[in-house]
From Swiss-Prot:
The active site is at residues 76, 146. HAMAP family: TIM_B (MF_00147_B). This is Triosephosphate isomerase. Keywords: Gluconeogenesis, Glycolysis, Isomerase. It comes from Anopheles merus (Mosquito). Belongs to the triosephosphate isomerase family. Signal peptide: none annotated. Its EC number is 5.3.1.1.
Length: 206
């Protein structure tokens, strides 16, 4: 449960050099924030691209800040696939969330079909390019590489596969944004990460 997870994280020990953020469903955001120390962040799993208006059911970055949150996850593959969110919409959401003072975990990643067709880099670059068109300051952005075929399927990208994409993304940032951003930006891997494989994944340079 979220309560148990929060208690485990609160008890630690955690690496003081590693930023820990818990992303949970909207109804439990206040609960998580109340159970965790300030040193651990809480992220919503989605928000909308405008501050206010008639968007019944949507949550704005301002509302998330009212709950004491500092983070939001945007562009998750399920939002793209199930709810039809486009690269452009996700980029607009990222820009608005950043403008409102939130930190953003922006998700990218290819499907199994795209990987088997040799399109992994093309898809990841396309998704990242849309975000880059809207972002001027990258200091509050984390890129999450989440191959769709490895999310909740039990299949995991090998550490080598993950590293290959992360390295390609850094090269893309160097060529299309700046070397400084490429060196500084955090790129994390998500997709069936377990206690058994996390050490090997974390050991990769990118």
């Amino acid at each position: 449960s979220i309560t148990e997870l929060c208690k485990t994280l609160s008890a630690g020990p955690l690496d003081p050099n590693t930023e820990v953020v818990v992303g949970c469903p909207a109804p439990y955001l206040s609960l998580a924030r109340s159970l965790l120390p300030e040193t651990i962040g809480v992220a919503a799993q989605n928000c909308y691209k405008v501050a206010k208006g008639a968007f019944t059911g949507e949550i704005s970055p301002a509302m998330l800040k009212d709950l004491g949150l500092g983070w939001v996850i945007l562009g998750h593959s399920e939002r793209r696939a199930i709810f039809g969110e486009t690269d452009e919409l996700i980029a607009e959401k990222v820009a608005h969330a950043l403008g409102e003072g939130l930190k953003v975990i922006a998700c990218i990643g290819e499907t199994l079909q795209e990987r088997e067709a040799g399109q992994t880099e093309a898809v990841c670059f396309r998704q990242t390019k849309a975000i880059a068109a809207q972002v001027k300051d990258w200091s509050n952005v984390v890129i999450a590489y989440e191959p769709v075929w490895a999310i909740g399927t039990g299949k995991t990208a090998t550490p080598e596969q993950a590293q290959e994409v992360h390295a390609a993304l850094r090269k893309w940032f160097t060529e299309n944004v700046s070397a400084d951003v490429s060196n500084a930006i955090r790129i994390q891997y998500g997709g069936s990460v377990t206690a058994a494989n996390c050490r090997e994944l974390a050991g990769k340079p990118d």
